Regions:
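Intracellular loop-helix junctions on the cytosolic face of multi-pass helical membrane proteins
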Residues: 1-15, 110-125, 129, 137-281
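Central cavity-lining transmembrane alpha-helices of secondary-active solute carriers
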Residues: 52-78, 94-101, 168-177
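Helix-to-coil boundary motifs at intracellular loop junctions of multi-pass secondary transporters
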Residues: 40-45, 76-77, 145-152
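Helix-loop boundary and gating motifs at the non-cytosolic
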Residues: 2-62, 262-281
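Residue-level signal for conserved functional micro-sites within the alpha-helical transmembrane segments
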Residues: 30, 60-63, 67, 135, ...
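C-terminal ends and interior cores of transmembrane alpha-helices
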Residues: 80, 89-117
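Conserved glycine-rich helix-kink/hinge and helix-boundary motifs of the Major Facilitator Superfamily
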Residues: 20, 53, 57, 88, ...
Length: 281
């Protein structure tokens, strides 16, 4: 039986737990994406540094476009499929896309491992775009559900905290498993990754997807989305934001004029660039 919100603004503990694991699949795959994508395509698939970087760039561009599209469309969606919640419907679409595409991103090209590199490039780019679309679906809708689950600031902070705790745990898990797998299978020189180590990435990928999928099942079974009409939910959200007089609803144009937006974006971008550059010699 799905746990429900015990009071309009208080989320039950089982519901908090179910919500907190709803982004684990994204966290696990994102950790592997940013940490090992360049390593895999350069050392395992034997792409050039430039080609590996282009695949990463394609993924990030697809992510940016998909995030914008899904952000607007998920808000405009009024009902979910077959009576399912509108946010959880988009989230489920994302899970299906991620689970169906991510394993192909970190495995050798099926029946085309000996094909020309340009053909393999197209093969991987196709699955990367699908993966990034699915990742954006799950990320946007999962975060959006916080405002619909509760209007109490303390409860929202708690949900965000639990969500972030699982993000940290997911990153640690990926690094720990990768360290164990590389240490066991890489031979004497554990820093030398070659195409012969493709099975390591295959094992890591299926481990990540398997655990992430289990958490997604917990999320979809364990959390009940609000049954209020979309218009009423949005109205209640606006009232909660403006009730104190401290917060005002911002348009996207005003949001782009906020300096904090660019500060956070630059810090995040340069941090990722430094991390990615250190992965491949």
């Amino acid at each position: 039986m799905e746990p429900v919100v015990s009071q309009p603004d208080v989320v039950s503990k089982p519901a908090k737990l179910a919500y907190s694991v709803g982004h684990v699949l994204n966290d696990l795959t994102a950790s592997m994406w940013f940490s090992y994508l360049l390593v895999f395509y350069h050392r395992i698939v034997n792409f050039t540094n430039a080609s590996s970087g282009y695949l990463l760039l394609i993924g990030q561009i697809a992510d940016a476009l998909a995030t914008t599209f899904i952000g607007f469309e998920s808000d405009r969606t009024r009902t979910g499929l077959f009576g399912y919640g509108r946010r959880k419907t988009w989230h489920l679409i994302g899970v299906i896309c991620v689970v169906g595409s991510f394993p192909f991103c970190f495995n050798l090209c099926i029946d085309c491992a000996n094909s020309d590199l340009w053909a393999q490039f197209i093969y991987y780019a196709m699955f990367i775009v699908i993966f990034q679309f699915g990742w954006s679906c799950s990320q946007i809708t999962h975060l959006s559900m916080i405002n619909e689950l509760t209007h109490k600031e303390g409860e929202r902070v708690a949900l965000n905290s639990f969500r972030y705790a699982w993000t940290v745990a997911s990153n640690i898990f990926v690094y720990a498993i990768a360290s164990v797998l590389l240490g066991v299978h890489s031979g004497n020189d554990k820093t030398d990754i070659t195409p012969a180590d493709a099975h390591i990435f295959r094992t890591l990928t299926f481990t990540v997807v398997g655990i992430g999928l289990f958490c997604m099942i917990m999320f979809h079974i364990g959390l009940k989305e609000s049954t209020l009409p979309a218009e009423e939910t949005e109205h209640r959200l606006q009232l909660s934001l403006t009730a104190s007089g401290k917060l005002k609803r911002m348009t996207w144009k005003k949001f782009l004029l906020e300096k904090e937006f660019y500060q956070c974006a630059l810090i995040w971008m340069f941090t990722r660039v430094i991390l990615n550059v250190t992965q491949v010699e």
